[in-house]
Amino acid sequence: MALTAEQKKEILGQYGLHDTDTGSPEAQVALLTKRIQDLTEHLKVHKHDHHSRRGLLLLVGRRRRLLKYVAQVDVARYRSLIERLGLRR
């Protein structure tokens, strides 16, 4: 269920500012989005897994806060990010 090192490296290569970038908001949002997608698929099969559902809600809230920060700092970066990730906003 957790992201493998290869998956993280691939995501960070696409969305990070440089190869070893793990701290930029874009990289963090991209990693959170992948984790949210994986958890959503898990919960489609395991509908009664309430602990994972709570974890999903926490991840969504964290991603929302990071996106809010990016929107406040630079609207162009925010729009580019949500377009590349395919998020509805």
Curated annotation (Swiss-Prot):
Instruction: List the SUPFAM superfamilies.
Output: S15/NS1 RNA-binding domain (SSF47060)
The record's Gene3D superfamilies line, in alphabetical order, gives: 6.10.250.3130, S15/NS1, RNA-binding
Q: In its keyword annotation, does this UniProt entry include Ribonucleoprotein?
A: yes
Q: Which SMART domains match?
A: Ribosomal_S15
Q: What InterPro entries is this protein classified in?
A: Ribosomal_uS15 (IPR000589), Ribosomal_uS15_bac-type (IPR005290), uS15_NS1_RNA-bd_sf (IPR009068)
* Keywords tagged on the record: Ribonucleoprotein, Ribosomal protein, RNA-binding, rRNA-binding
The entry describes its oligomerization and partners as: Part of the 30S ribosomal subunit. Forms a bridge to the 50S subunit in the 70S ribosome, contacting the 23S rRNA.
Q: Which family does it belong to?
A: Belongs to the universal ribosomal protein uS15 family.
Functional summary from the UniProt entry: One of the primary rRNA binding proteins, it binds directly to 16S rRNA where it helps nucleate assembly of the platform of the 30S subunit by binding and bridging several RNA helices of the 16S rRNA.
Q: What is this protein called?
A: Small ribosomal subunit protein uS15
- Source organism per entry reads Mycolicibacterium smegmatis (strain ATCC 700084 / mc(2)155)
The taxonomic lineage of its organism, from the top, reads:
Bacteria, Bacillati, Actinomycetota, Actinomycetes, Mycobacteriales
